Amino acid sequence: MINYIFSKSNILINYVGFTVVWFSCVYSGAQGNPIIAIVPTFIFLLLHFSIVTDHLKQEIQLIIISIILGLVVDSSFSLLGFVKYNGTLDFAPNLAPLWIICMWAGFTAQINHVMKFLIGKYLLICFYGLLAPLAYIAGEGIGAAIVKDTYLSYGFISICLLYTSPSPR
């Protein structure tokens, strides 16, 4: 019973933690202040790592791989002209900004926890991947990014994120 309660509360902590990270990252992009994204992400990851002590090494590896993959994918979106992110570095305007990298780290921390119910549910995984453009629409609405050539961009973003997102173990 105690293990059940802890497992459910850990999922809730993980979900709420990522929600805070997501909003702080998008707000960080809108404000052009990376600290707004870094601090909540760091706190969330510390809390997350304290929960996943039984497979900490694998979780850290997954997050690092996801950060690298996210950097490549979102930088490609910018380089191809699909998305213009706010908060980029002056000397590397097509490099995905820090707030996007923080978002990838936070998102990946959910994969083996909040999204664990997706294991083996391939249609649901595809549907979840197709919802990714909604995050870009919300980010655009808040002022963190501008999506250009809307239909083509959102289609491309959906396909890329569907194929690049790690799946639950």
What is the predicted role of each segment?
Residues 1-15:
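N-terminal membrane topogenic signal
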Residues 12, 16-24, 60-76, 80, ...:
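Hydrophobic, lipid-facing residues on alpha-helical transmembrane segments of integral membrane proteins
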Residues 31-40, 58-59:
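Short, aromatic-rich membrane-interface segments at the entry and exit
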Residues 75-93:
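Membrane-helix boundary elements
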Residues 50-61, 116-120:
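Membrane-interface helix-boundary motifs at transmembrane edges
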Residues 24-33, 50-53:
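Short, hydrophobic transmembrane alpha-helix segments
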Residues 149-162:
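Membrane-interface transmembrane-helix boundary segments in multi-pass integral membrane proteins
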